[in-house]
């Protein structure tokens, strides 16, 4: 005679259904989030989407947004950086002013300090394409060193040595990274 515990079998079935439901829910959420916040389609379509997002999220002029969007996407793809993260970094660094120059000598859209990056970023840093490409290179380099995008963005602001050296500099870098992430979130909502 075999004894079957129906309450035990019901519990197993209930757990299996709950697990399936949870997995399906997570898939639906992930798909809907990526559909809302990512660039898709052909290169021209992604450039147009990003241009529209820059105009709506950051009030970038249509001419500037249309000119810079393809450069941002090309540089982001070349260095395996999210185009929305690179666009948010530009918003934070220069507010899309290609002639920007900081008191410390940082130049252009991504505010590159030429003395630090001269070897790996040759060319005129006031040239928008050169500058965006260099910013993507720097961010990618820091990501490989830091292991996370948040830390890479903090490094972009204070450098890896500054980040490691003191609590206050690390705090400044983390605050900067939160600001860039906020700009990225704003852009993704506008896409």
Model-derived features with residue positions:
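Substrate-binding/active-site groove segments that recognize
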Residues: 103-120, 135
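Substrate-binding/catalytic groove segments of enzymes
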Residues: 118-119, 142-152, 162-165, 188-190
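Short, low-complexity, Pro/Ser/Thr/Gly-rich segments in the mature regions of secreted, periplasmic
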Residues: 170-190
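A short, structured beta-strand-centered segment in the mid-to-C-terminal lobe
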Residues: 122-131
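Acidic helix/loop microenvironments that form the catalytic cleft of cell-wall polysaccharide enzymes
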Residues: 94, 148-173
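Sec-dependent bacterial lipoprotein signal peptides
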Residues: 2-36
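Short, functionally critical alpha-helical segments immediately adjacent to catalytic or ligand/cofactor-binding
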Residues: 70-73, 77-97, 112, 132-136, ...
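Export/targeting segments at the very N-terminus of extracytoplasmic proteins
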Residues: 37-91
């Amino acid at each position: 005679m075999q004894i079957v515990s129906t309450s035990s079998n019901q519990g197993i079935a209930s757990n299996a259904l709950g697990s399936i439901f949870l997995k399906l829910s997570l898939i639906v959420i992930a798909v809907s989030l990526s559909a809302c916040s990512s660039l898709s389609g052909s290169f021209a379509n992604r450039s147009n989407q990003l241009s529209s997002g820059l105009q709506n999220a950051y009030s970038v002029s249509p001419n500037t947004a249309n000119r810079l969007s393809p450069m941002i996407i090309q540089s982001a793809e070349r260095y395996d950086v999210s185009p929305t993260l690179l666009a948010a970094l530009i918003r934070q660094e220069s507010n899309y002013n290609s002639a920007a120059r900081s008191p410390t000598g940082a130049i252009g859209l991504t505010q590159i300090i030429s003395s630090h990056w001269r070897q790996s970023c040759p060319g005129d840093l006031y040239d928008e394409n050169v500058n965006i490409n260099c910013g993507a290179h720097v961010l990618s380099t820091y990501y490989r060193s830091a292991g996370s995008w948040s830390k890479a963005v903090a490094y972009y602001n204070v450098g890896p040595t500054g980040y490691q050296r003191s609590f206050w500099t690390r705090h400044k870098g983390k605050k900067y990274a939160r600001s860039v992430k906020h700009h990225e979130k704003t852009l993704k909502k506008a896409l």
